[in-house]
Design a protein with these regions (language model features):
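Short solvent-exposed coil/turn linkers within tandem alpha-helical repeat scaffolds
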Residues: 10-20, 47-56, 84-96
Length: 108
């Protein structure tokens, strides 16, 4: 896993498809290594790198689910609502209502 992190940290692309995927992989690696905070950071960076209906909702969803796991329900709700508002037609957007309902129950 350490070698993967070293490689991905050196990886630099301007490509709007591969660059977010590399950043998302860094997030995956950090989560696997037990650092969900760093995972969230990388997922949000990946989501913001390419504003499209394929990559962005995937990484917003991953960050939202980690926030939810960490008990940060307001942050999770914000990300889920962003998916609902901007990416409703994505795979994640089509099932986002149940995630929103779940975190709202935790907040109330």
């Amino acid at each position: 896993m350490k070698r993967l992190l070293d490689y991905l940290n050196k990886y630099s692309l301007d490509d709007e498809i591969l660059a977010p995927q590399a950043k998302g992989l860094l997030g995956d690696a950090k989560v696997e290594l037990g650092d969900p905070g760093a995972g969230i950071k990388y997922y949000l960076e990946a989501a913001d790198m390419a504003d499209n209906s394929f990559h962005t909702p995937i990484y917003l969803m991953k960050a939202g689910m980690l926030h939810e796991t960490e008990g940060n329900y307001a942050e999770a709700l914000s990300l889920y609502e962003r998916i609902q508002d901007k990416y409703a037609e994505s795979n994640e957007g089509r099932s986002i209502d149940k995630y929103i309902a779940r975190v709202k129950l935790q907040i109330d």
